[in-house]
A protein has these predicted regions:
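Thiamine diphosphate
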Residues: 1-135
Length: 135
């Protein structure tokens, strides 16, 4: 961001804040694993991090704001894409909901043998995905 501001580039970034690494958590669960240390609230911690992405972006020279709803996100995005400079729009999101498998098949290794039913099911899904990949 700082470089884009320094170089007088124009871009709009939308940061979806799910308080952790939601996409990795969904991938981990989707491959039969149990959620582990991907979402801040579920990880080992003494103090939960409260990252202020708006302040962080602004500290690097970007115009930054937080959208409180999808309608506000749409309005802020429409404004941002029509002006020069770096804009950052942050919106809080739920880390769980997503398109199936993130909208595409990821070839992520799944154990062939496991005592967990979720892993056995994920392995079968991996085999099916591999067949589709190879045609």
């Amino acid at each position: 961001l700082a470089t884009a501001v320094m170089m007088d580039r124009s871009m709009t970034l939308i940061i979806t804040d799910n308080r952790g690494f939601g996409c990795i958590n969904r991938l981990q669960v989707g491959t039969g694993g149990a959620p582990f240390n991907n979402l801040f609230a579920d990880s080992q911690h003494e103090v939960l991090p409260e990252i202020d992405f708006v302040a962080h972006a602004a500290s690097m020279g970007a115009r930054a704001c937080k959208a409180g709803s999808i309608a506000e996100l749409e309005a802020l995005t429409a404004e941002a894409i029509n002006r020069k400079g770096v804009d950052v729009i942050v919106i809080d999101t739920d880390p769980g909901p997503s398109t199936a498998a993130g909208g595409t098949w990821w070839e992520v290794g799944v154990p062939e043998v496991s005592e967990r039913a979720e892993v056995a099911s994920a392995y079968q899904g991996w085999l099916d995905g591999k067949k589709r990949q190879l045609g």
